[in-house]
Amino acid sequence: MEVLMAERADLVFHNKVIDGAAMKRLISRLIDHFGMAYTSHILDQVKTLGFQQATTTSISLGIDDLLTIPSKGWLVQDAEQQSLILEKHHHYGNVHAVEKLRQSIEIWYATSEYLRQEMHPNFRMTDPSNPVHIMSFSGARGNASQVHQLVGMRGLMSDPQGQMIDLPIQSNLREGLSLTEYIISCYGARKGVVDTAVRTSDAGYLTRRLVEVVQHIVVRRTDCGTIRGISVSPRNGMTERIWIQTLIGRVLAYDIYMGPRCIAARNQDIGIGLVNRFITFRAQPIYIRTPFLCRSTSWICRLCYGRSPAHGDLVELGEAVGIIAGQSIGEPGTQLTLRTFHTGGVFTGGTAEHVRAPFNGKIQFNEDLVHPTRTRHGHPAFLCYTDLYVTIESHDILHNVNIPQKSFLLVQNDQYVESEQVIAEIRAGTSTFNLKVKEKVRKHIYSDSEGEMHWSTDVYHAPEYTYGNVHLLPKTSHLWILSGGLCRSSIVPFSLHKDQDQMNVHSLSVEQRYISDLSVTNVRVRHKLFSSDSSGKKGGRAPDYSGPDRIISNGHWNFIYPAILHENSDLLAKRRRNRFIIPFQSDQEREKELMPRSGISIEIPINGILRRNSILAYFDDPRYRRSSSGITKYGTIGVDSIVKKEDLIEYRRAKEFRPKYQMKVDRFFFIPEEVHILPASSPVMVRNNSIIGVNTRIALNTRSRVGGLVRVERKKKRIELKIFSGDIHFPGETDKISRHSGILIPPGTGKKNVKESKKWKNWIYVQRITPTKKKYFVLVRPVVTYEIADGINLETLFPQDPLQERDNVQLRVVNYILYGNGKPIRGISHTSLQLVRTCLVLNWDQDRNGSIEEVHASFVEVRANGLIRDFLKIDLVKSPILYSGKRNDTTSSGFIPNNGSDRTNINPFYFKARIQSLTQHQGTIRTLLNRNKECQSFLILSSSDCSRIGSFNGSKSHKVTKESITIKEDPTIPIRNSLGPLGTVPKIANFDSSYYLITHNQILLNKYLSLDNLKQTFQVLKYYLMDENGRIYNPDPRSNIIFNPFDLNWCFLPHDYCEETSTIINPGQFICENVCISKYGPHIKSGQILIVRVDSLVIRSAKPHLATPGATVHGHCGEILYEGDTLVTFIYEKSRSGDITQGLPKVEQVLEARSIDSISMNLEKRVEGWNERITKILGIPWGFLIGAELTIAQSRISLVNKIQKVYRSQGVQIHNRHIEIIVRQITSRVLVSEDGMSNVFSPGELIGLLRAERTGRALEEAICYRAILLGITRASLNTQSFISEASFQETARVLAKAALRGRIDWLKGLKENVVLGGMMPVGTGFKGLVRRSRQHNNIPLEIKKKNLFEGEMRDILFHHRELFDSCIPNNFPDTLE
């Protein structure tokens, strides 16, 4: 101690802050100068001093010490302003979602970084002794970023996927977080805590594996005699500090000459003095020895290892350097983060360097060398193809700037730039060839509104999804979602509305689905629509319509349609001339009877006019259908006496139109008989009145189907055979039945004849047959009874709607029997006979003002689910009555397709109150393509999405005048000229509903507008509507959109609007918000122009979404999107500059030699690539040997560099030699390959590299092998000691294998001896023992040979340098960073 006191006078007083780093430097210098013992004394004093001062100071931390940075307010405000502008651009469709996200993250990141920089100077100026300020730089745990969270702002947090949440936390912990901010920050904060715990265990496991690999490496000799080394030179962007670190403590491999003079000899260790001389003399390259070029097989020599880290001398013999290396790499693992919360380069490009203008001036460059593009923030820019020279000239100064290729130029040619303005952005990673790994990330954009999708450019299918709906964008373009309410009709699988129909809609605000409004509207045309398709009820009864039916009254037609159609209903309508049948399937059990299907047939006269009480449709119930001929009888219960007797059997020629008998009866009877009609010439094989059995041959190729009595009647041209089945009774006196002929007897009437006292269970028909005059007998024939149920309950088919008006069509159900009473019905063979037909009779109420005698009927075709269905439309043509008592002219409305005559009378003022209700819920249907077959949908364009823009000579007068001006405008100006040669289309909305839909005070209409004007306007103004391709727009009407007029934006153009001054406007064109249409016209909302009129535009509002090339578009053009559907998927690159796997996982990934996807520096592949290339150059025998050597050298260097890079990025310093020892172990194995193999090793065997070389030399033949990269786990399971392997992992497996192979463990390593409790073969006390063994090794011959061999190899390497340069990546950098 006295020594120190004495020297104190000479010491210089140093007034500087000593933090952790300065302390490190101080201690290392002290050790260099004074040695260990002396330094420890000094440090002791420092310690005492430090604690003494800390005790007297007693720093405490209170909440008042957290001072918020004053400039924070306006910084945050500024950032918010920028975000707002960004949001606006996104809304206008100028930037897409990914660009917006990137930009907002960068805005906030910059803000928070700026605040962080402000923090330090702010403390220094306002309160230098602030405890927070003092502590933040004390070198204790915690750093500026934590202080920044306390007094600056917390900034951006990441979400569980590792993406940044673009909502920053603006408050700091001093001010306190809001609830939202707290929830956002929870994940990141928890993650930090959990990470620390997980990290500790990970680092521990890593250390264990590392030690396992290298535990047997001990320093055992002084010099192994290698003459190889690796070159270290300060090039390659290596900083001088790292270079010095690499050199100090190493041993030189060669003499270093400066001219003729040798400044350092081989095997000399490098100290700080020597390094300084190297720096002064710039001698390069310097070759140094490294552990992985050591010739020892399983241990290491002193010179290859260099100085011991503990003291400044060469490492001692017997030092367990392997374990030291493993621990020095594993221990800092706890300091490495699992994932940094470094937020800047979350998106591609990391940070870009900016080129700024040196002074004000005009900028010039060659425009041919650039092409326009977008930066990653969506700003317009130019991309340079090649290096570009940019000239900035100001007055007389010319300044040249060279901009590298692939950079963005942010200014235009000949633009005036100001000083310090950013003119170009150099993309990070272009200047050097550093391998920034990019990964691709998908981001889905979801639609936030519902409507119809539109593309503004061509979109092509991705080749692999030719039939799917995945489309790629070839160039930057907008996707539009045209607004419109959606009608998801799950109720109806098909819809009756055609495109452009109008419909009354009530929107349910909650559900946002539309249910039809049944109010009566202005147009008094009634259309009825009947559709009768259904699936059959069980048991084959009349159709069962499950579910309530709906009537859509959409202002023009009332449609009635069944609510639910089942899957199995067969809905293909067959159309014949003027009648079509809609078949419906009866139940499965009835199918077995093989009856043809029945259906409802609707018949319409050819002229389409139906009279009152005419039959509109009939339905043949399959229950009343017989396949055999017979006679129908009906009447009251009991005997029908009207029937004539024998002439029943007379044949009547069937008329083409049979009279129909309306049934008033409950039941009728059918007496079956079999009838065969034969040509007159054919032989008959049975006699008249004979009795035959079943299947008797009656003619040449005819057999009887039933047995019974045969009657043969010969007509002029044919013979008619009838076979009556039944019992034959010969008359007895007491038999009462026999007296009657041709009568029906009800069941229960028994015969009086006691012998055959037999009750008849069913109805019977008694018929007397007299073959001769005197003889007769009675034939008792079975009768089929039909009860008439209400065949089809029409209430279910076409329910009456309570809201319908009285003048509606009425339908009555009438059952008709098709054949007269007692008339024989002849069935032609194999056809069925329908006995009863149910008819629908059309009728309508009388009107007070006189009746309509005829109606028009027409078929409407509705296509749904790919099937075409026909519906019947009945127009009751009526003249509406105006409340003013005047008749209105009939104006033709293009809505009634099939009759063509002007049947519609439009009257907008049917009631005064009507108009107001009308304007709210009138809409137009737009049909849309929908892939979903089960559930069609349509959009209702409703007025909430519409705006109109009026500017009438700038008049700000009241709405009234505007309205009247517009209407007084001469409506006869043709619009055709401005529209070009496109056809007209049915109007979007009826004139009345769309024109006045915006008037907010409806009373005006009645006050100011005369009807005459209206009439004129009606006739003249037509709307034009077409799509972009110039076709008249009519998409596949599978599903519908209903337009409400409120979905349309009205944009009124000024009167002096002329085309030259402003944009030419076409229907179908899309307009973004903020586009000026006319000179002083207002800005309009974005949307598609639907209607161009003389004085106004109608714009259907739409939301643009920008998409860049390569984005995937989901769905089809014109398809319906619901809220929350995926609209576009962007694929953007995100730099993996070690933010995703960094720190520990990254080290582990390198050490375990795992190939993780999309990491280009995939080492195993590289190793293989080098193997192949070198073999190609040098030919086989040399190729393998040198190939393996070179590959191994190369991969070792790059491995060391990669591991070092991770640690350095985290500020952890580890000496290269530790990493080198580990790397040596995982790269020191080779795989014996098949070709040219020796009989020593089997192919595919893993052997040590040195062993392979020695065996090759001993056998004097080349062993072919190739380098292989083992991970640390595999390397630990591939050592020479099975005990060490078994104690690491998979004990049973390792031991079993070792036993089978009969392996011997020589107990060379540490672990084996520890396991067996022997003495460990390490420790510096072993010196003498090792030295003795060195005496025997000094036979120089072997060494000389070896050296020659190696020198030879070196020369080859140097000669082939040029070759390698051309074929080996990275110019084979043999350098250590």
Swiss-Prot record:
Q: Which reaction does it catalyse?
A: RNA(n) + a ribonucleoside 5'-triphosphate = RNA(n+1) + diphosphate
Cellular localization per UniProt: Plastid, Chloroplast
Give the enzyme's EC designation.
Answer: 2.7.7.6
> In its keyword annotation, does this UniProt entry include RNA-binding?
no
Instruction: Kindly list the biological process annotations in GO that this record carries.
Output: DNA-templated transcription
Q: Which region is the signal sequence?
A: none
- InterPro entries, A to Z: DNA-dir_RpoC2_beta_pp (IPR012756), RNA_pol_beta''_euk (IPR050254), RNA_pol_Rpb1_3_sf (IPR042102), RNA_pol_Rpb1_4 (IPR007083), RNA_pol_Rpb1_5 (IPR007081), Rpb1_funnel_sf (IPR038120)
Keyword annotations from UniProtKB, A to Z? Chloroplast, DNA-directed RNA polymerase, Metal-binding, Nucleotidyltransferase, Plastid, Transcription, Transferase, Zinc
This entry's comment on the bound cofactor is: Binds 1 Zn(2+) ion per subunit.
Q: Which cofactor does it need?
A: Zn(2+)
Gene3D superfamilies to which the protein is assigned, alphabetical: 1.10.132.30, 1.10.150.390, 1.10.1790.20, RNA polymerase Rpb1, domain 3
Q: Where does Zn(2+) bind?
A: C224, C294, C301, C304
User: Which GO molecular function entries does the Swiss-Prot or TrEMBL record give?
Assistant: DNA binding; DNA-directed RNA polymerase activity; zinc ion binding
Q: Which Pfam families match?
A: RNA_pol_Rpb1_4 (PF05000), RNA_pol_Rpb1_5 (PF04998)
NCBIfam families noted in UniProt: rpoC2_cyan
- Protein name (Swiss-Prot/TrEMBL): DNA-directed RNA polymerase subunit beta''
Which species does this protein come from?
A: Calycanthus floridus var. glaucus (Eastern sweetshrub)
The root-end lineage is:
Eukaryota, Viridiplantae, Streptophyta, Embryophyta, Tracheophyta
